[in-house]
Amino acid sequence: MTDRVTHRVSLDDLNLEKQKFDSKDDIKPWLQDNLQSTKGINVVIERSDTSKIIFKCKNKEKKTKIVESKKTASKTMIRKHTSCPFKIRANYSVRNKVWTLSIVSDEHDHVVDLPRSFVGKNLISNTIPGSSLNVLDSVAPRSNKKGIKPTSEIANTPSVTSYSPSCAVKRNEDVDAPKISSKKARNLTKKPSTQSTRSSSSSDGSSIVSFGSLTSQSSSTSLPENYKGQVPTSMDSMVVEESLTGKSLKPAASHPVKRKNMKANTMKKSKKLKQNPIVVSPIEEDSNLNSFDDANIDLQRQQSLQSPLSHLVQNQDPISLEQNPQLHTVYPQPRHSKQSSSLLKKNQQQDRIPDNMPLQPQENNRTLQNFPLNQFNANEILQNVQQVVRETVKSEILDSPNIDNTYKTDMMDSFVSSVILDYKDYLSSQFLFSLKQNLYDRREATHTNVDLEQNGSNENLFDEQPQHKHNHQHNENQFSYQSQIQNQRQNQNQNQGQNQNQNQSQSQTPGQNSNQNDSQTQIPLQSQTPQDRKSAMQQNWLPGSTPGVGGLIRLSPLLNDNDNNEYAAVAAAAVVGSTPGNPNGNSLENFTHLPGINSSTLNYLMQLPHPSANPNSGGVSSSQPASLMSLQGHQGLLQQQQQQQPMFSMQNSGQQLPPLSSIPKLPSSNNANVNLNSSSTLPLPLNNTGPTLNPSSLLKSTSRNSTNSGNINVNNINNSNNNSNSAFNSVFLNSSITTNPAFIFNSQGNPTNSNQSMVNSIMTTNSNKDGTATSNNNSSGNTSNNLLNDMPNYGPGW
């Protein structure tokens, strides 16, 4: 292994040992400022402790080959970390409580760059002070690629060199010294201190040589083969002429130029070329022209690509527009916001133009706009525009924390509509027609009434600005065709609605027809409101079912909540002739509107029609005057419809109710003791009525007739006897009792009379609620004719 060449830089002029610091943090900034500005050394902290800090040189030559073995079989040593021996130590004095500096080693294994303060100096002093005699030159030969110096170079090369602040150069050994073997060179490198003292004791005349001879020797040795492309050192780039008269030495060549200045020069060339752009085909372009590839040029390319698209958003990037004013003058923008980025890329190929190519005038740039765009370029343009618009909308509107969510939708609607209106002159008629078609389909989905005049006004949505006559006529023809299609759809919907009404009217029973005489006809499907359509769907969800009493759901009456047809059959049976002297006139006090019972078989239990409606009933007529019981309007018509109703309708498995006129009226007398006759018994329940009787139907209540049920009791008018109220009339006419279904089935009477406990409990409770005293609870009527004895026959549904 060969020895490394070391370079020593003197730090005596800085007087580091005399510096004292109170704080630990002040040491590194001070060292970096002084060493970098005067010596060109950049230091970093290698180790740090509470009482010491070790600074080392920040070597730029990391991971480079240093030495290589003579034998090819041995491994090559590669520097992975900084191996420069330069070190400065900072020690903390506990007694004095200050930090002091000490130089551990001022040697380097690499060439130290020229300090910043010496770059601009043009004069080099001729006089060399005595203190700088021990300072060695920094321009030393580097090892070659193999790390072994040739024998011809060893004789003429010093082992340790340095430079002083005054740039005085000194030789350690004589030029005509004999050849030094490699062993002696190794010994000299191991003892740099002895050589430095020897150099200080030598005389001035024998040690100082001319700069010309030094630079001629160092130029052949200081630049090895692997050291290519780097900036030469400060002494190599200077060729100093020494006058024979001993005058001051002046440099004959310019100072060394760093890479940063070289980049600046190349940038100036590229900027000059940008003023006169030339169209170059990508096929004819030379692939070897890569001399102007630079990061700054790439940055300008990106800015030039983004600047034409930045005008889509107002005030988005004013700085980029100001930085590139030439782009707007050289490349005029079209009327649209769509700029081809591929054309801009072709324009940017001017950066790779060779110097020998003649420049063309600026008028040739207009040929770029006449190039036809293929599908790839069009897609690229659309993607660029969409990306800019999406990012802008997302950042300015959607992701803006200052805008509420309620206003974001309005802003998006306004933005899209303004874009369409601004560029509608360049949109195709098919696109506008599709927009209008979608608009009309949307309105038909909401089932709003759309007239032809309104359609005409809506068709002018995009016609606010003048258009070409051809496009306008084409749009009118399409709109007329659209209106014809829409009228045909409306006619079809109306015909379907009429056919549906006819089918429903034919399938209805006479009882159902009576319920729908006063109802309106079915609204056409197109003019229906959402509520009407919802109710129609609820009524017609079963096949063959129609709204009304006949359209009930078979399992439970709870699912039939049609308020329009509620108790229509009850009202039809109750209304009779309007003349006061009609002996057959039926009254409302004989039945009441039970709230919540919708078309159930319990209806006939609570309705008490006149006995004359059924001549075979044999019931006792009531003694109340007919003038207090009659209603006004439509009695004759409803009575005729009532007589046409059949006794039972078995088509729906016992769901329809029997006519109310066939139900016998219970006797009403002044005697509270009720003795039922076999002729006045209620008809037997319908077949298979157990599953249809749901007790939850009694819990449903409506407020339509609840306030009138307790006011139509005529038996309470001008009756001197407090016990004149019939037991059953009180039960079925008093809203406070009938609203509680549990009252009918709870036995609260005398347990000794088990056969009449149900009826007696009802009578007792009713008389107590009305404030009367009824004590006749020991009636000995026919127990087999009790009203509620047949109640268990309705099945387990109760």
UniProtKB/Swiss-Prot annotation:
<keyword id="KW-0539">Nucleus</keyword>
<dbReference type="GO" id="GO:0036267">
    <property type="term" value="P:invasive filamentous growth"/>
</dbReference>
<keyword id="KW-0843">Virulence</keyword>
<dbReference type="GO" id="GO:0030447">
    <property type="term" value="P:filamentous growth"/>
</dbReference>
<feature type="region of interest" description="Disordered">
    <location>
        <begin position="642"/>
        <end position="718"/>
    </location>
</feature>
<feature type="compositionally biased region" description="Polar residues">
    <location>
        <begin position="518"/>
        <end position="543"/>
    </location>
</feature>
<dbReference type="GO" id="GO:1900436">
    <property type="term" value="P:positive regulation of filamentous growth of a population of unicellular organisms in response to starvation"/>
</dbReference>
<dbReference type="GO" id="GO:0036170">
    <property type="term" value="P:filamentous growth of a population of unicellular organisms in response to starvation"/>
</dbReference>
<feature type="compositionally biased region" description="Polar residues">
    <location>
        <begin position="153"/>
        <end position="165"/>
    </location>
</feature>
<keyword id="KW-0130">Cell adhesion</keyword>
<feature type="compositionally biased region" description="Basic residues">
    <location>
        <begin position="256"/>
        <end position="274"/>
    </location>
</feature>
<keyword id="KW-0804">Transcription</keyword>
<dbReference type="Pfam" id="PF08731">
    <property type="entry name" value="AFT"/>
</dbReference>
<comment type="function">
    <text>Transcription factor involved in iron metabolism, oxidative stress, surface adhesion, hyphal development and virulence. Functions as a negative regulator of MRS4 expression through the CACCC AFT-type sequence in a gene dose-dependent fashion. Acts as a repressor in flocculation, plastic adhesion, and surface hydrophobicity.</text>
</comment>
<protein>
    <recommendedName>
        <fullName>Iron-regulated transcriptional activator AFT2</fullName>
    </recommendedName>
</protein>
<feature type="compositionally biased region" description="Low complexity">
    <location>
        <begin position="774"/>
        <end position="789"/>
    </location>
</feature>
<feature type="region of interest" description="Disordered">
    <location>
        <begin position="449"/>
        <end position="545"/>
    </location>
</feature>
<dbReference type="GO" id="GO:0006879">
    <property type="term" value="P:intracellular iron ion homeostasis"/>
</dbReference>
<keyword id="KW-0408">Iron</keyword>
<dbReference type="GO" id="GO:0036180">
    <property type="term" value="P:filamentous growth of a population of unicellular organisms in response to biotic stimulus"/>
</dbReference>
<feature type="compositionally biased region" description="Polar residues">
    <location>
        <begin position="646"/>
        <end position="656"/>
    </location>
</feature>
<dbReference type="GO" id="GO:0007155">
    <property type="term" value="P:cell adhesion"/>
</dbReference>
<dbReference type="GO" id="GO:0010106">
    <property type="term" value="P:cellular response to iron ion starvation"/>
</dbReference>
<feature type="compositionally biased region" description="Low complexity">
    <location>
        <begin position="705"/>
        <end position="718"/>
    </location>
</feature>
<dbReference type="GO" id="GO:0034599">
    <property type="term" value="P:cellular response to oxidative stress"/>
</dbReference>
<dbReference type="GO" id="GO:0009267">
    <property type="term" value="P:cellular response to starvation"/>
</dbReference>
<feature type="region of interest" description="Disordered">
    <location>
        <begin position="142"/>
        <end position="274"/>
    </location>
</feature>
<feature type="compositionally biased region" description="Polar residues">
    <location>
        <begin position="748"/>
        <end position="773"/>
    </location>
</feature>
<dbReference type="GO" id="GO:0006355">
    <property type="term" value="P:regulation of DNA-templated transcription"/>
</dbReference>
<dbReference type="GO" id="GO:0005634">
    <property type="term" value="C:nucleus"/>
</dbReference>
<feature type="region of interest" description="Disordered">
    <location>
        <begin position="331"/>
        <end position="365"/>
    </location>
</feature>
<feature type="compositionally biased region" description="Low complexity">
    <location>
        <begin position="476"/>
        <end position="517"/>
    </location>
</feature>
<feature type="region of interest" description="Disordered">
    <location>
        <begin position="748"/>
        <end position="798"/>
    </location>
</feature>
<dbReference type="InterPro" id="IPR014842">
    <property type="entry name" value="AFT"/>
</dbReference>
<dbReference type="GO" id="GO:0000981">
    <property type="term" value="F:DNA-binding transcription factor activity, RNA polymerase II-specific"/>
</dbReference>
<dbReference type="GO" id="GO:0045944">
    <property type="term" value="P:positive regulation of transcription by RNA polymerase II"/>
</dbReference>
<feature type="compositionally biased region" description="Low complexity">
    <location>
        <begin position="193"/>
        <end position="223"/>
    </location>
</feature>
<keyword id="KW-0805">Transcription regulation</keyword>
<feature type="compositionally biased region" description="Low complexity">
    <location>
        <begin position="657"/>
        <end position="695"/>
    </location>
</feature>
<dbReference type="GO" id="GO:1900445">
    <property type="term" value="P:positive regulation of filamentous growth of a population of unicellular organisms in response to biotic stimulus"/>
</dbReference>
<feature type="compositionally biased region" description="Polar residues">
    <location>
        <begin position="449"/>
        <end position="460"/>
    </location>
</feature>
